C-alpha cells in the first residue's frame, strides 16, 4: 500500500492529468485514509468505513485517466470495471459479485509478485541448476557443471536449445469450457475450468524444447512458486483485498433507470440494487474463500449527460457520500494536455516520427491552433473532451505519417497555417459529420 501523502499523490497525478484539482484531492485523501486506518488499534479500526466517491463530469475530462494513474499509485488491489457489464442476479450475464472475485484475483497476483521477489535469489539458483541438468545431465562431474555454469553466467549458451519440463500455466483439461453468458465459468465459489483441469491431471507438464535465454523466466517463476506457501499467500491476499481493496466503477450513469421505461430493467435498476449490499458491506463467496467488502473503497464515475445523479437509487446515492464535479476543459487546458504532461500527445507524436528519421517541429501558434480547433469542433458537434485532440492531431500529421518512410532526415515545421490548412475540411463539415457513422 502506498505511503504517499495527499500532496504527493496530487503532484504525481499532475504529471499526467491537467486540471481537475477537486477530483485529485478527493481521491488523494481517500487513498491516504486507507493508510491512516491501518495505524489505528483495537475495535475503532473496524468501525472506520471508507468514504466512497462519486465523480461527475463530461466525457473526456479525465475521470477514467485518474483511475488509470491511481491504479499504479495505489500499491493495493485495484480493479476498474464498467457498470454496464453487469446484469441483475438471476439473469444470464455477470452479476456484481464478480467484481469482488476479480479483485481477489488481482490481490493474489500482487501478493504472489511480492512473495516471488522475496525468494528470487533461491529461485534463480534452482532454475540455473535445472538448466545445467538439461545441458550436461544430472550425473555430470562437478568440474563439468562448474565449467558450464561459468559459460551460462557469461551468456555464452543463450542460443542453445534445451529440453525442459514446465508446469502448465493454467488448467489444460477443458480450456474452452464456459457457461453461456458467464465468462470464466465462475459459479459462486467454484471455478469449473479449474475443477475439470485438476480432475483430468492438468497440472502435469510436458517436455518442451526452448532456448536457454527463454527458459530462465518461466523456470524462475515455477521455482518461486514452489518456495511459496499457496495457502498463506491466499490468506494474505484476501486480507489485503478486505483492508485496502479499491474498485473504480466507471459509467455508473448508464445504469440509471430511464423514465417511461416499463418491464424488467435487468442491466439498470436491478444492478443498482445488487450494488447496494456490496458497497455497504457484505460477504462474497469466492473460490478462495469468503471475502468481506466492508472496507473496500468504491469510486464511481459517470458523465450524466442524459441522466442526473439524483436518478440513481436514493440508497445508492447515500452510499457514495463524497461528490466531486469535474470541470469541462478549456483552450488553455487543451494546450497543457498537448505539451505539459509527462507523456503528452505532442511528445508521443514527435517520438513516433523520430523512429523514421523525421523531426517534427511544432511552433507555439501550432499548439494554440490545435487546441482552438479541438474546442471549436467539440462545440459544434458532440463534446468528447480531450479525446477530440487525438482526432485533430491525427488529421494534421496524416500526410507526414504516410510519407515518413521516404522523408528520412527531414525536419518538418508545423505552424498554425499548416494546422488550419489540414483541418479546414474537418472544421467546415462538422455539421455534416454527425450523420456519418
From Swiss-Prot:
Xref: SUPFAM superfamilies: P-loop containing nucleoside triphosphate hydrolases (SSF52540)
Subcellular localization, as worded in the UniProt entry: Cytoplasm
GO cellular component: a single term: HslUV protease complex
SMART domains: AAA, ClpB_D2-small
Keywords: ATP-binding, Chaperone, Cytoplasm, Nucleotide-binding, Stress response
GO molecular function list: ATP binding; ATP hydrolysis activity; peptidase activity; proteasome-activating activity
Binding site for ATP: 18, 60-65, 250, 315, 387
Top-level taxon: Bacteria
GO biological process: protein unfolding; proteolysis involved in protein catabolic process
Listed HAMAP family: HslU
Family label: Belongs to the ClpX chaperone family. HslU subfamily.
Subunit composition and interactions: A double ring-shaped homohexamer of HslV is capped on each side by a ring-shaped HslU homohexamer. The assembly of the HslU/HslV complex is dependent on binding of ATP.
Its biological purpose: ATPase subunit of a proteasome-like degradation complex; this subunit has chaperone activity. The binding of ATP and its subsequent hydrolysis by HslU are essential for unfolding of protein substrates subsequently hydrolyzed by HslV. HslU recognizes the N-terminal part of its protein substrates and unfolds these before they are guided to HslV for hydrolysis.
Official protein name in the record: ATP-dependent protease ATPase subunit HslU
Amino acid at each position: 500500500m502506498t505511503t504517499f501523502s495527499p500532496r504527493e499523490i496530487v503532484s504525481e497525478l499532475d504529471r499526467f492529468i491537467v486540471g481537475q484539482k477537486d477530483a485529485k484531492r478527493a481521491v488523494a485523501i481517500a487513498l491516504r485514509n486507507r493508510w491512516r486506518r491501518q495505524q489505528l488499534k483495537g475495535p475503532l479500526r473496524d468501525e472506520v468505513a471508507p468514504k466512497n466517491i462519486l465523480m461527475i463530469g463530461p466525457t473526456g475530462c479525465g475521470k477514467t485517466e485518474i483511475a488509470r494513474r491511481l491504479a499504479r499509485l495505489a500499491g493495493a488491489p485495484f480493479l476498474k470495471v464498467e457498470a454496464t457489464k453487469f446484469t441483475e442476479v438471476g439473469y444470464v450475464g455477470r452479476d456484481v459479485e464478480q467484481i469482488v472475485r476479480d479483485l481477489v484475483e488481482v490481490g493474489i497476483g500482487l501478493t504472489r509478485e511480492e512473495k516471488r521477489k522475496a525468494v528470487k535469489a533461491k529461485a534463480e539458483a534452482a532454475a540455473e541448476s535445472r538448466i545445467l541438468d538439461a545441458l550436461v545431465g544430472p550425473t555430470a562431474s562437478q568440474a563439468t557443471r562448474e565449467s558450464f555454469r561459468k559459460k551460462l553466467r557469461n551468456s555464452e549458451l543463450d542460443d542453445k536449445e534445451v529440453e525442459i519440463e514446465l508446469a502448465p500455466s493454467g488448467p489444460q483439461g477443458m480450456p474452452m469450457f464456459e457457461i453461456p453468458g458467464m465468462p470464466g465459468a465462475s459459479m459462486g465459489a467454484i471455478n469449473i475450468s479449474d475443477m475439470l483441469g485438476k480432475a483430468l491431471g492438468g497440472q502435469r507438464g510436458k517436455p518442451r524444447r526452448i532456448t536457454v535465454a527463454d527458459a530462465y523466466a518461466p523456470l524462475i517463476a515455477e521455482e518461486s512458486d514452489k518456495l511459496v506457501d499457496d495457502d498463506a499467500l491466499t490468506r494474505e491476499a484476501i486480507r489485503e483485498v478486505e483492508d485496502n481493496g479499491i474498485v473504480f466503477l466507471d459509467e455508473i450513469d448508464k445504469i440509471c433507470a430511464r423514465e417511461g421505461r416499463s418491464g424488467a430493467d435487468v442491466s439498470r435498476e436491478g444492478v443498482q440494487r445488487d450494488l447496494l449490499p456490496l458497497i455497504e458491506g457484505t460477504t462474497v463467496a469466492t473460490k478462495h474463500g469468503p471475502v468481506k467488502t466492508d472496507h473496500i473503497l468504491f469510486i464511481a464515475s459517470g458523465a450524466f449527460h442524459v441522466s442526473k445523479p439524483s436518478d440513481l437509487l436514493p440508497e445508492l446515492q447515500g452510499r457514495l457520500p463524497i461528490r466531486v464535479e469535474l470541470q469541462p476543459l478549456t483552450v488553455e487546458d487543451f494546450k497543457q494536455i498537448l505539451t505539459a504532461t509527462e507523456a503528452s500527445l505532442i511528445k508521443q507524436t514527435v517520438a513516433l516520427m523520430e523512429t523514421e528519421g523525421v523531426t517534427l517541429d511544432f511552433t507555439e501558434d501550432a499548439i494554440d491552433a490545435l487546441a482552438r480547433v479541438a474546442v471549436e469542433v467539440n462545440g459544434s458537434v458532440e463534446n468528447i473532451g480531450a479525446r477530440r485532440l487525438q482526432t485533430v492531431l491525427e488529421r494534421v500529421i496524416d500526410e507526414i505519417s504516410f510519407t515518413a518512410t521516404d522523408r528520412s532526415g527531414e525536419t518538418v515545421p508545423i505552424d498554425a497555417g499548416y494546422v488550419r490548412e489540414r483541418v479546414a475540411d474537418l472544421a467546415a463539415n462538422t455539421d455534416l459529420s454527425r450523420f456519418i457513422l
